[in-house]
Amino acid sequence: MPAEMQAPQWLLLLLVILPATGSDPVLCFTQYEESSGRCKGLLGRDIRVEDCCLNAAYAFQEHDGGLCQACRSPQWSAWSLWGPCSVTCSEGSQLRHRRCVGRGGQCSENVAPGTLEWQLQACEDQPCCPEMGGWSEWGPWGPCSVTCSKGTQIRQRVCDNPAPKCGGHCPGEAQQSQACDTQKTCPTHGAWASWGPWSPCSGSCLGGAQEPKETRSRSCSAPAPSHQPPGKPCSGPAYEHKACSGLPPCPVAGGWGPWSPLSPCSVTCGLGQTLEQRTCDHPAPRHGGPFCAGDATRNQMCNKAVPCPVNGEWEAWGKWSDCSRLRMSINCEGTPGQQSRSRSCGGRKFNGKPCAGKLQDIRHCYNIHNCIMKGSWSQWSTWSLCTPPCSPNATRVRQRLCTPLLPKYPPTVSMVEGQGEKNVTFWGTPRPLCEALQGQKLVVEEKRSCLHVPVCKDPEEKKP
C-alpha cells in the first residue's frame, strides 16, 4: 500500500537534548534499569566516563540526582505509561514519552542521546460531568444523646431535591447537632489516680529463695465515686508487681577481630570490587551485651583496565528485493517467483559473540506491482494519535481506503521436489479500482480536533 494512503499511526515530537558528557568525574554504576531509566548498583565516585564505560552494560550520573546515562550504544527506551487524562469528565487528551539513551552515537532517525519523544492521544475517563443535587427540608430533632446532665441531639436531611447525577453531590452537611439538657444529675464513677513510684527491689541478685520484685500502688480518688446518686467503684487491682531488672550477670559487649586479606577482583574486565571481612569474636558478646558496631565487610574498587566484550546485535532487515523469476516475466501473471532480504550484524567489539541466525531471508511471492485490480472500500480506521502532540490545536484523523481484492492464487507452491510445500505471499502495490466515495477514488479522510490538550513537560525536571 503506498505511504500516502496510510493513516498516521505514531505522532512524534523530539524535545530537550541533554548536554554532552565530558571527561569530568562521574558516579559509576553496574546496571542501567531499562524499565525506570535509573542507575543501580553504585560502583564508585569520581570515576572517568571512559573508565566506567569500559563495560557497555554499566551506566553513570554526572552528579547525585542527575539523569542516569547508559554506557551502551544509543537506543530508544520503552514508552512510558500514558499520563492522566487532561480532564476528569467528557473528552480530553493524554501524553506519553520515551528517551534516546546511550553514548557514542545516535538513535534511529539521527536523534541525539537525551532527546525526549512525545505521543498524544484522545482519552475519556468518564462520559459525563457531575451535576450537583439539592437538599430536602430538615427532619425533626432526635432524642438527647444522654439520660442525665447535658448532651446533644441531631436532625438530618436527604440529598434528593433533586438527586445528584454522574458522581455529583449536595454542598453542605447532611446532619446538624445542638445542645440538650435532661435536667438530671449524673452519678460520679470512680477513677484511678496515677501509679505511685516503684519501691526498691526486694533482692540484690537472681537465683534466691524468692523472685526479687518491685511494687507500686494507686488510689481510687481521681475522682472518688459519688454517694448520691451512687457511682461505680474503680475496677482493677490497687497494687502492681514486676520482676527486678539489671541484676548480675553483667552483659559483655562484642569486639571486632582483624580484617581478612583482600579477595581477588570480582571481574576480569572493566571495574570491579575486592572484599575484606572481619568477625565479632574479640570478644564475642555475652549475657545480652551489644553486638559489634560497624560493618563486617568492606569493599574496595579494582580496575582491570581491559575493555569487556560486546556481543554483536542484528540490525533491522533490509527491504525485500523485487519479486522475479529467472528469464520469465511474472508481473500480474499468477506465476510464483522469489525475493530476498538481508541484514547485518553490528556493534561487536572486544571479541564479543557474533550474531546468531541467518544473514539472508528468502521467500516465494506473486508479483502484483502496479496490477489493475477490482477494489472495495474498507471500514473506517481507528482514530490516529493527535498531532502535533504539544499543541493546543492538535487534530486526529481516520480514513477509509480503496483496498484491492487480491486474486485467488494458490497459497503454497512446491518449487523443488522433496522439499515440501512453501507459503507464497503477494508483493508489490496494486492499483485498485473502486466506485467514487464522497468524490474520492482512493482515500476518504475525516479530521477532528483534540480537546483539552495538556502541556508537555520533561518528567526529569525537578518540581519547585
Swiss-Prot record:
GO terms for cellular component: cytoplasmic side of Golgi membrane; extracellular space; secretory granule. A positive regulator of the alternate pathway of complement. It binds to and stabilizes the C3- and C5-convertase enzyme complexes. Inhibits CFI-CFH mediated degradation of Inhibits CFI-CFH mediated degradation of Complement C3 beta chain (C3b). Residues 24-72, 73-130, 132-187, 189-251, 253-309, 311-372, 374-457 form the TSP type-1 domain. The keyword Cytoplasm does not apply. Residues 346-354 are annotated as: Interaction with Complement C3 beta chain. It is found in: Secreted. The keyword Metal-binding does not apply. This is Properdin. Glycans are attached at residues 79, 82, 135, 138, 141, 147, 192, 195, 198, 204, 256, 259, 268, 317, 320, 377, 380, 383, 423. The gene is Cfp. InterPro entries: CFP_TSR-0, CFP_TSR_C, Compl_asym_regulator, TSP1_rpt, TSP1_rpt_sf. It holds the Pfam family TSR. In plasma, properdin exists as dimers, trimers or tetramers in the relative proportions of 26:54:20. Interacts with the pro-C3-convertase enzyme complex (C3b-Bb) comprised of Complement C3 beta chain (C3b) and the Complement factor B Bb fragment (Bb), where it binds (via its TSP type-1 5 domain) with C3b and Bb. This interaction stabilizes the complex and allows it to become the active C3-convertase enzyme complex (C3b-Bb-FP). Interacts with C3b. Interacts with CFB. GO terms for biological process: complement activation; complement activation, alternative pathway; positive regulation of immune response; positive regulation of opsonization. Coiled coil: none annotated. Its main location: secreted.
